[in-house]
Amino acid sequence: MVHVRFAPSPTGYLHVGNARIAVANALFALRYSGKFTLRLDDTDLERSRDEYAEAIAQDLRWMGIEWADTFRQRDNMDRYEAAADALKASGRLYPCFESEEELRYKRELRLKQGRAPVYDRAMLKMTPEQRAQAEANGKRPYWRFLLSDRTVGWRDGVLGPRQVKLQAISDPVVIRADGTPLYTFTSVVDDIATGVTHIIRGEDHISNSGVQTDLFEALGKVAPALAHLPLLMDADGGKLSKRIDSLTLRSLARDGIEPVALVSYLARLGSSRDPQPLTLAELAQEFDLDAFSASSARFDGSQLAALNRRTLQTMPFSAVQDRLPQGATEAFWEAVRGNLDMLAEARLWWDVVAGSIVPPVLTDEDNALLKQALPLLPQEPWDTTTWSVWTRAVKEASDRSGRALFRPLRLALTGEEHGPELAALLPLMGAERVRTRLTLTSGAMAG
């Protein structure tokens, strides 16, 4: 069975870049009736916070993503210790004692010599006696993984054939001096323990994947299938910063972006398919890693906003009823949804049809038109034909047409230059409110 995982670090709020990876994993699991696990990579105890862990879970649920299993890495220290012991016994983990200053000096020296700043494995040459002496002097070792002297290759699910030359990479530190295991190591151990079959993540993990493939094999396992999505860029082709608060899911939700719109946008971003407002189930039916380009994708806020508008236009009343102003009806929603950039704007139009507006100040000529229009209002009950019946009568009486006719009426009735069709709004407003607004506006002083 397909088993994927989404593994954020709870050191901040979920950003669109990570959210895209979560969406890809969730859709892949749905597409193949597989399992989706939420793993919190929280071994960095200093930076990880419970509030971020909870926020990540909330944001995923907001997008409609559910998981079959979830766990925190901090709860699996025994698992990592056992794996580390096995690697130490096989000679693949070795202790190191160099300070950051010593390592920096070595890197600078190699660069001056025209050599790649790869760790020189000097600690492999230490004798047991030298190690014992270092520890006796108060030094605590950190541990590196001894990489194989080879090139690791795989067929990437998005990028195609990929290779990583392990000889060109420093042996990674996998356990700090304080005993804390690091991501490169813990991720592999957890993927083995939980039976992950596919790893879908960003292309910034390409080198990690080479190293981790070697780690899988050192632990006697075959690495899962790998797929790396190209990183997101901003609309201008620059790097998309994870530090921009406006691109966290929390901020996007506050700004009125609908979860369906965001998921639909992220699901197809960088692929050959245009985004459409679809449910997770609908997106999963056609989800295919082969559809993604190997080139970087651009996250364009204006495109997301446009998709948000389209999403609102397709949402039924039942999906938004609880978030509309109290008393709002299905007829109201049908009338206004085509004019909304975000759902919160429905409040403005509810005030128009059921509340009050500030009377606009019009010219004397426009006020005269309103006075002509007032007695021509049809008798109730009103329906969607009332507007055309009324304006036809006003046109004949005033000899006005087009913008000269419709603009003063719209301003007087709604206080806005543009908006939903007045044929739909007029029956919702009712005759009494319409008469009151025409009277108040036409009696206002012209500017």
Swiss-Prot record:
Record's catalysed reaction(s): tRNA(Glu) + L-glutamate + ATP = L-glutamyl-tRNA(Glu) + AMP + diphosphate
Span of the annotated motif 'HIGH' region: 8-18
GO cellular component terms attached to this protein's record: cytoplasm
Keyword terms of this UniProt record: Aminoacyl-tRNA synthetase, ATP-binding, Cytoplasm, Ligase, Nucleotide-binding, Protein biosynthesis
GO MF, any single term: glutamate-tRNA ligase activity
UniProt superkingdom: Bacteria
Residues given in the record as ATP binding sites: 242
GO biological process, one term: glutamyl-tRNA aminoacylation
Pfam families from the UniProt entry: Anticodon_2, tRNA-synt_1c
Enzyme class: ligase
Annotated localization: Cytoplasm
Motif ('KMSKS' region): 239-243
Family listed: Belongs to the class-I aminoacyl-tRNA synthetase family. Glutamate--tRNA ligase type 1 subfamily.
Assembly: Monomer.
Function: Catalyzes the attachment of glutamate to tRNA(Glu) in a two-step reaction: glutamate is first activated by ATP to form Glu-AMP and then transferred to the acceptor end of tRNA(Glu).
HAMAP family assigned to the protein according to its UniProt record, in alphabetical order: Glu_tRNA_synth_type1
Protein's recorded name: Glutamate--tRNA ligase 2
Lineage: Bacteria, Pseudomonadati, Pseudomonadota, Alphaproteobacteria, Acetobacterales
Gene: gltX2
